[in-house]
Amino acid sequence: MYGESLVKLMLALDVMDEKKAVLIAKETSEYVDSIKIGYPLVLATGLNIIDKIKEATNKEVICDFKVADIPSTNEKIAELTLNHADGIICQGFVGSDSVSAILNVGKAKNKKVIMVTEMSHPGATEYLQNVAEDMAKMADRLKVDGIVAPSTRPERLEEIKSIAKDAFVISPGVGAQGGNLSDVLNVLSENDYVIIGRAIYENENPKEMAKKYRMQM
């Protein structure tokens, strides 16, 4: 890892080509702490892409599947995913039983379970924002490992973080979505993550862009 920083950098790698994904992951691995992949890459390439990225980078890989189903289905998705990945992201709005089903799998496999409270896009203010504090309370009660809260609205990030005190935060929205890194760093603390995706992987030189963000942290 390049230098020392209290706040960690998570690369959101939402490309759909296997070779490109592995190359970018490997090139940026010196400057990132964790790599987050989602449905675009896994649906295009299969679950084995997780193992390939881990092997190429020696970094943890978190699957951002935002799992949101009934408990029995959530359990199956978590089982399949966590046979490969180091962690999985689920939605909180489906309720405590559905989240607990994933938590049980995570605990059995010693893997991270991260729950969405409020997303970073404008549409999240229409519905999710109204129940984000309640979901943060649920995250605190269930003792999830981490929560998702938005970099695009630092005041919301701060409020949600103050509720789920024991969970680490992963915060999307810096870069292409317009979130300000300095504002976010004023809120986040040790063991929290800033998530940056397109600003790095769409750049002509992803390695240099990852380094640039790391040096600002």
Curated annotation (Swiss-Prot):
Ranges that cross the membrane: none
Principal EC category: lyase
Pathway connected to this protein: Pyrimidine metabolism; UMP biosynthesis via de novo pathway; UMP from orotate: step 2/2
Entry annotation: catalytic residues: 66
GO CC field: cytosol
Record's catalysed reaction(s): orotidine 5'-phosphate + H(+) = UMP + CO2
Keywords assigned by UniProt, alphabetized: Decarboxylase, Lyase, Pyrimidine biosynthesis
One Gene Ontology biological process: 'de novo' UMP biosynthetic process
Role according to the record: Catalyzes the decarboxylation of orotidine 5'-monophosphate (OMP) to uridine 5'-monophosphate (UMP).
Cross-referenced PANTHER family: OROTIDINE 5'-PHOSPHATE DECARBOXYLASE
Name of the featured protein: Orotidine 5'-phosphate decarboxylase
Protein species of origin: Methanococcus maripaludis (strain C6 / ATCC BAA-1332)
